UniProtKB/Swiss-Prot annotation:
The gene is pepX. This is Xaa-Pro dipeptidyl-peptidase. It comes from Lactiplantibacillus plantarum (strain ATCC BAA-793 / NCIMB 8826 / WCFS1) (Lactobacillus plantarum). GO terms for biological process: proteolysis. It catalyses: Hydrolyzes Xaa-Pro-|- bonds to release unblocked, N-terminal dipeptides from substrates including Ala-Pro-|-p-nitroanilide and (sequentially) Tyr-Pro-|-Phe-Pro-|-Gly-Pro-|-Ile. InterPro entries: AB_hydrolase_fold, Galactose-bd-like_sf, Pept_S15_Xpro, PepX_N_dom, PepX_N_dom_sf, Xaa-Pro-like_dom, Xaa-Pro_dipept_C. HAMAP family: Aminopeptidase_S15 (MF_00698). One of its GO terms (cellular component) is cytoplasm.
Amino acid sequence: MKNNQFAIVPTDSETAIAELTKIHFITPDMDALTTVPAVYQALLAKSLPEVHTASGLTHKFNNIMATSQHTLSEWLADATIVNNQVFYNVGLQLLGFLPGQDFELADPLLAMRDIHLPMVGDSAFDREALYYAWYLLLNTRGNNGQTLIESLTTRGYFVPFYQLPNDQKPLFFNGKAQAVFDTNALIRDVVYVEAPLDTDHDGQRDLLKVEILRPAETETGLKVPVLYTASPYNQGINDQAGDAQMHNVDVPLTAKEPDENTYADVEFQPTTAQLPAARTATTTTDTAEETFSREKSYTLNDYFLARGFAVVYAAGIGSIDSDGLAPTGDVDETTSTVAIIEWLTGKRQAFTNRDGNIAIKAWWCNGAVAMTGRSYLGTLATAAATTGVAGLKTIISEAAISSWYDYYRDNGLVVAPDTFQGEDTDVLAAEVFSRSLKAGDAHQIQPAFDQKLAELTADQDRASGNYNRFWDERNYLKNVDKIKADIIMVHGLNDWNVKPRNVANLWDKLQAVPVTKKLILHQGQHIYINNLQSLDFTDMMNLWLSHKLYGLDNHAETLLPNVLVQDNTQAQTWHGYDNWWQDTTDALDFKVQYKELVPADHTVDQRAAHFTDKLPDKLFDHYKHHLDSWQRDLLQEDKLNPLYDHRLLFKSWQAPEDQLLVGIPHVAGSVAVNKNFGMLSFMLIDFGAARRLTVSPQILAAKALDLGYHWREDDLKDFKLAGETPFKMITKGHLNLQNRHHPWHAEAIQPNVFYDFSVDLQPLFHHLLKGHQLGLVIYATDMKMTIRGNQDLQYSLNLNDIRLHVPMKKITD
């Protein structure tokens, strides 16, 4: 294990002792202890909250080695001092590390340094130094990725604190909320928020079902903040309807009618519809009428339920027990998302049921809201933030879409999210329209939704792939300047579902917005990262939310790096940076000749290179069903490779030193095609034999992360180094040749005439090792993402015109 810990708050000795006293590790009876070993033994006893007898403690101490020759019990019997070797021998075992396997009893300090664990340098401790070392140990992450204080939490240490009076809750330790709330006593309510919408046109404002989990202490006056997850999947998914709506991608690319469109021609202009009157409450109450059993939860939310935060889930318009129609990303969906926040902050009404008009307020909420979630969930958090809604203090958006065009299209082409060939906005709407799963409701509402679905299918315009008003309405980047909430963005550099451009564009736009923003880039695909062993992500979010929602002064904004990136060359290695590419001035610039990428100052030959897109039918069918085989063959250099004549491949010289490629690679050149339409696709490749990180985090221990005491669990995971591979695709991009200048403007092209093109690839942050080669692949049909017409398209590129620009940072550590 290699520890990467960013959420530990630097603390002086006086503050540490005060905090230890607050959580009862230092108690008045310890004043009578006259020796440091006696104080140490008292601290050790408190670290075993599951043990209630002296004989039980002796048994536990007998299973811990203090030195290579003595158990902890034996050592305590004769100890006159506490030195750092014994302290960290014992401490490492309390943290779950094994002597002889994870560290050596003869030199625990070496392991502390190698694992990157914080420690005190004193060779021998007086009482004050012991307390400080113990405080630091409690805040040190163990082999299961949790701090020692979190480990004690899961074993019941904070159970006596459940009885604290409300004015002593929540309880913070080292700047983070602790689990002093009984999750067995959580209150579960259902309410129905009235949104300022009538999307199903039934003459009534849409009601939105909301599921609430809140601490029991709210019943006696404690007001708590909310973690709100807007999840269209929350009430169920109609997979069958989605599958039926999927589009055939084995269709030909066709010529578009040229146009003179400018952005003004496709800009979405919001309209104000006449709304039905709001419902009139007949009475008010503080008590919900409905409850629920097990919500579809996010484990990060589960963690905070034990720590003084309420959690709210809402699936929004078109979902079971709500009104409205699922619209996939439009303004109405944003409005429905924001309506929940407005109710939580007292600005909108909700009711205890769908028919009785009995109003209920969020009287238990302190008015501070954060939004959490990944993918569509994080997308709606981003959408809500761009409205500037009051009360939304922060969002933690993971793998979030910032523009739906960048999710389903690319430069005038239909480009699917990875593994979802044929999906589009209408498919997603059909899936999340869970009202269709309730027969009675579906009987009434299905005709209206079928009409809505037909509108989505028409307006998304798969025939052209162009950016239009439909997509402009679903572009949250237009309203980034309205954001008032502070933001943490999390994204996978290998996420080809929600591609990196989505987070990169949001991050770039936020540079001009006066909010605090943080960015975490990991090496995964479309995943959550709150269960990684090597990163204290959950503690980071605890630090952040304790500050943002409870107003705790814990230095969260300065302790967390602006940009935190997982290294792709080493396991369990993370680096902090001031920015992504925005502070970058260096770059690698290449021309091409024959099969090489050469430095831009080289003279290259005047010649053209050619490839054909059409494959033999049998091979085409094989690749459709074996996409990994297609990508592997695309990158093979062997002339017998079936794709050798179906793409161009250029490789740089070996890197003379490690290079950090960051930001947006850019390819320019000139191309001709034998038809009046065409497309180009591009990949950047890291060529070089190396052990690379696994595509997905591997389970290290199932259900090893306890999120509270007798509460929910999560698997402990992390990326590992896999077997050696010869190359890795690091980014890609696509271009419709009729959209060489703008995605909303289709230009005519003539067969066999060369046209200049210029295209940005997906942003990257990649460590290229010394001796590796950078590769550029130029091809047409992307079997994983574009439509696949398998047409007789012949492409020619002027090699002397091709340029590749890749921004880079100097590696300084």
